[in-house]
Amino acid sequence: MKYITFTVPCYNSAPYMRRCIDSLLPFRDYVEIIIINDGSTDATPEIADEYALRFPETVKVIHKANGGHGSGVNAGLAHASCKYFKVVDSDDWLDRRSLQKILLRMMHWEKQGKQADMIVCNYVYDHLYENKKKSMSYKNVFKEGKMLTWNDIGIFSPSQYLVMHSLIFRTEILKKSGVTLPEHTFYVDNIFAYRPLPYVESIYYLNTDLYHYFIGREDQSVNEEILKQRIDQQIFVTKIVASCVDLEEVKEKYPKLARYMTRNVSIMMAISSIHLLLIGSEDAQKKRTDLWNYMKTH
């Protein structure tokens, strides 16, 4: 039985995508891998097809016109056939032992007739070229080894929040939430890690470093100068996150979740505001004012 669909969105990922895909293959009998070739102009399509030819029972390839990271996630979710779903960016990779732990837990649940709507694991900021690593844990928020609800969670630290890298969702939860990511837009992972949360009724935390988030490419969207260049996209995503969930409704059922989600919106607002201030132009000031006015009405 295959338990997790891994979707790997790829755009001109030839230099590093093998590291990512190879990290998913050790347990290929239990996973589905969907490689999304998002209109690449390098050797990405050929590499993807090579994997599909070598591992036809595990790897599927979708070739599509370029639509950006969000469209790749959308395509993967639309074609996912497993109970659980996770996005792995093509320059990142998973830890083998951690993946084994997760699969063993899923097998155990299957025998018991149980399931989790959302699985949370640690992730690692991996500064590969500098040989530095920093693990981001959630052991202060979630009790390990127990099926939890939002009413059971602890308090997130100021720099701690749920991100795409740390989450595995039950596929049906994602579909039920209606999460669809905008095309040709950066920072859409904020939507993916936010909108489905009110639909999650069972949470399971494994205190293991599953996801390695590669830091080091100059064109990464988290780079400060790149973020300033793409500030309109950051604002666009911030507005979507701020308006896609009725937090008053969430508060009635899960007050702790509502508190977390409110803080999440506040963090995104702060990021947008600070970078608009750093840009410092008259146009940036107008955008900052418009953003705050938008927030007041939503």
Per-region residue spans from a language model:
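Short, well-formed alpha-helical segments that are part of the catalytic scaffolds
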Residues: 12-26
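Acidic helix N-cap motif at the loop->helix transition within catalytic regions
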Residues: 16-18, 42-51, 63, 93, ...
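A conserved acidic beta->alpha catalytic loop
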Residues: 23, 37-47, 67-68
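Short beta-strand/loop segment that forms part of the nucleotide-sugar
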Residues: 30-39, 60-65, 89-90
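Glycine-rich, basic loop-to-helix element that forms the pyrophosphate-binding segment
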Residues: 64-80
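Donor-binding/catalytic cores of nucleotide-activated saccharide
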Residues: 69, 92-203, 211-228
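Short aromatic/hydrophobic "clamp" motif used to bind/position activated sugar donors
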Residues: 85
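C-terminal subregions of glycosyltransferases and related glycan-biosynthesis enzymes
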Residues: 214-298
